[in-house]
């Protein structure tokens, strides 16, 4: 190969690499996309009527979920930072004892009859969403796979790559020991971790989706 051709092909090669890293890597349009995570075994399979944004109360029941009540809000954006409305946000989590309302969760942690455990929300104006829940418990110590507190989320809207992820919380001592969390890069961990606001028990969590076409 002549020197000039070699330089040209090397330049094209590195450009190709750049394009690939923009498409499949973390960086797109200046914003990092929310990283993906596995679904886990406990996506709800028992039908339930109440899937609203307050997971601390079940419609028609008197009483409130046990644990620390927390508020989470945020916005959904595309990779260019445009807010996306009408995005479906389907989320589920363990109760404050670390137990899922799922027939396959056979840990000895108690069920909380007042905890809703599952919500399906839509992002509204400017892609905003919010929900009230309890701080999920770590899976019990006797569970074979101990997990740090997390919330599972499935996000979908026509025209965007659907996203399956998990939300984490800052300053959780188990984060460093969590098998799934540890596998992520520092930057990915940052994207997946809600940020504490100045209000007590309130967190901000923004979601970045990839346009499908
Ligand atoms: Fe989980």
Regions found by a protein language model. Name each.
Residues 1-18:
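N-terminal secretory signal peptides and thylakoid transit peptides that target proteins
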Residues 20-23:
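N-terminal signal peptide c-region/cleavage motif recognized by signal peptidases
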Residues 28-192, 196-213:
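Beta-strand-dominated extracellular/periplasmic modules and repeats
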